[in-house]
Each structure stands twice: as structure tokens, then as C-alpha cells.
């Protein structure tokens, strides 16, 4: 699993993609209306696909509602990721203390690793001695 900052960046990228998809949906499927009696709606050319594919009002509104809910859900996920970032509720001293504790844990783990490597080397020496004694017979 990726770290929180990467998750946050991915969530923001996905939110931007959702904004673009929402804009495209509204731009593509809105109802054509005039602002004044003098306005006219230009007919689309026969050899070109229509620029607007008007949907029935109830279908269009349902689509808008679903897209709005998706945007809200994604925004809430971003808020959660932001709130879970370290350091927002911790002072600098708390963060330094946490780093010191992590360094101590790392030192303990490194000592364990070194002991395991030493034990492995000892076992290899014993195995080598055993194999050499078997060859002599």
C-alpha cells in the first residue's frame, strides 16, 4: 500500500478527473434553451454529430445528482486523508520524540539483523566442516 501523501495525490487527481467528467456530462447532455425571444438555436449539420445530446430532464437531473454525490464522496475521502497526515495535531517536540523512538526501534532491529547474520555465518562454517569431514571418509 502506498504512503498517505501518494494516496492523497491520487485522490486529488481522481477528483480532477471527476470534475472534468462532470463538466463533460453537463456540457454534452444539457437542454438547449434560449435566453430571449430573439435567440435561435442553430440546427446541427447533417454530416456532423450533434454537439449536444439532450437527455430528458429527469434522467439529466439523476445523472447530475449521482455525479455530485461522487464528487462529495471523493472530497470526503480527501478530507480524511488530510486529517490522517502526521503532524497536524502534534507539536514539533512530539514529532521529534516520535522520530527518536523510531530510531531506537531501527537500532534494535539492526542489532537483531546483525546477530542473525552472525548466526548464519556460524551455521555455514559448521556445515562446511561437517561436509569436509564426510568427504574424508
Swiss-Prot record:
Region named Disordered: 37-56
Transmembrane: is it a keyword of this entry? no
Has keyword Nucleotide-binding? no
> Pfam families, per this entry?
Med21 (PF11221)
Assembly and binders? Component of the Mediator complex.
Per the entry, what this protein does is: Component of the Mediator complex, a coactivator involved in the regulated transcription of nearly all RNA polymerase II-dependent genes. Mediator functions as a bridge to convey information from gene-specific regulatory proteins to the basal RNA polymerase II transcription machinery. Mediator is recruited to promoters by direct interactions with regulatory proteins and serves as a scaffold for the assembly of a functional preinitiation complex with RNA polymerase II and the general transcription factors.
Protein name as annotated: Mediator of RNA polymerase II transcription subunit 21
Q: Which organism is it from?
A: Neurospora crassa (strain ATCC 24698 / 74-OR23-1A / CBS 708.71 / DSM 1257 / FGSC 987)
Q: Which gene encodes it?
A: srb-7
